[in-house]
A protein has these predicted regions:
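Active-site C-terminal subdomain of aminotransferase-like
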Residues: 22-23, 199-286
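Active-site-proximal loop->helix
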Residues: 100-113, 118
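Conserved PLP-binding catalytic core of the aspartate aminotransferase-like
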Residues: 294-313
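Conserved active-site segment immediately N-terminal to the catalytic lysine
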Residues: 187-199
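Active-site phosphate-binding strand-loop segment of PLP-dependent enzymes
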Residues: 123-180, 193
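A glycine-/small-polar-enriched, mobile loop at the entrance of the PLP active site in fold-type I
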Residues: 12-68, 72
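Conserved beta-loop-alpha segment that forms the PLP phosphate-binding cup at the N-terminus of a helix
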Residues: 61-90, 94, 98-102
Length: 313
């Protein structure tokens, strides 16, 4: 049996995945900060700083909770804290991850209205509008902003608030593979809940997944806590309000790394970072075209952060 090659601290190869992605050395070094007491003033300084910087990146005046979990954990937290048995939920589905989210909603007892589209395309805004027109009692609209499995990206997030506001529905965005690489205006676009994973466009190690909740959704969650311990967000709100703590032991080394990743994003500037991703994305698509390779997603639905290709014939 061949020995397993140990990874070194310095990056020696390019990880061309949706995530985990390459992690800057600054972020890696932050992870070896000595262990601290998670009920200490040192932790308060670390966690509060990371929370506030997360809210800046999401462009939200809501509250960020930094879950020690994968991105799927943050997505599931949104479901168990908002959705009750019999609630009607609209969700576009066009790939693996939107399908998983629809399944989570069904397991929560929701009446799920799936707007299915061919893989490589997105449900159109007109289809979403029609679903709202036909379902006045809808509780929430969920969407996977960036469908990693097919390389598609929804381009009408800024329009959905006109529909959710009309129906007084919650607006939830799964941004696991895109936040930090594309523009997100959470408050401006009327998004109630959004989440991501640290190992994607944030370029941090996997294991921390922020979920940001606005005041309206927070009020609902506090008044209707789920029957779960770890993903009960009202507990996180309470601990943060009272002491800037988390209710359970967090992944401390990962939090140090995560905060350093936030520092790098804000030093570069969110707008500059997004511009860089868009320029690199266009250059990459152009280069692939010159090689005779074709993207799986239709041009108008293509992601700017994840590229999926058709198999070569």
């Amino acid at each position: 049996m061949k020995p397993i090659k140990k990874a070194k601290l310095l990056m020696e190869y390019l990880v061309m995945l949706p995530g985990p992605t390459n992690v800057p050395e600054r972020v890696m070094r932050a992870m070896i900060t000595p262990m601290i007491n998670h009920r200490s003033d040192d932790f308060v300084e670390l966690y509060q700083d990371a929370v506030e910087k997360t809210e800046q990146v999401f462009k939200s005046n809501g509250e960020a909770v930094l879950l020690s979990a994968s991105g799927t954990g943050a997505v599931e937290a949104s479901v168990v804290n908002l959705i009750k048995k019999g609630d009607k939920v609209i969700i576009p589905t066009n790939g693996e991850f939107s399908g998983r989210l629809a399944q989570m909603l069904e397991w929560a007892g929701a009446n799920v209205i799936k707007l299915e589209s061919t893989p490589g395309t997105n449900a159109t805004f007109d289809q979403v509008k029609e679903a709202f027109d036909n379902n006045k009692d809808v509780k929430a609209f969920y969407c996977v902003w960036n469908e990693t499995s097919t390389g598609t990206m929804i381009n009408y997030l800024d329009k959905v608030k006109n529909l959710t506001a009309r129906n007084d529905a919650f607006y939830v965005v799964d941004g696991v593979s895109i936040v930090g690489g594309e523009d997100l205006e959470m408050d401006k676009w009327g998004i109630d809940v959004a989440m991501t994973g640290a190992q994607k466009a944030f370029a941090a190690p996997p294991g921390i997944s922020p979920i940001v909740v606005n005041n309206r959704a927070k009020k609902y969650m506090n008044e209707n806590p789920p029957k779960t311990m770890y993903f009960n967000l009202s507990r996180y709100f309470k601990y943060y309000e009272e002491a800037k703590h988390t209710p359970f032991t967090p992944a401390l080394p990962l939090l140090y790394a995560y905060r350093e990743a936030m520092n790098i994003i804000l030093e570069e500037g969110i707008d500059n970072r997004i511009r860089r991703h868009r320029i690199c994305s266009q250059a990459f698509y152009s280069g692939l075209s010159e090689l005779g390779l074709t993207p799986f997603a239709k041009e108008e639905d293509r992601s700017t952060v994840v590229v999926a290709l058709n198999y070569c014939k």
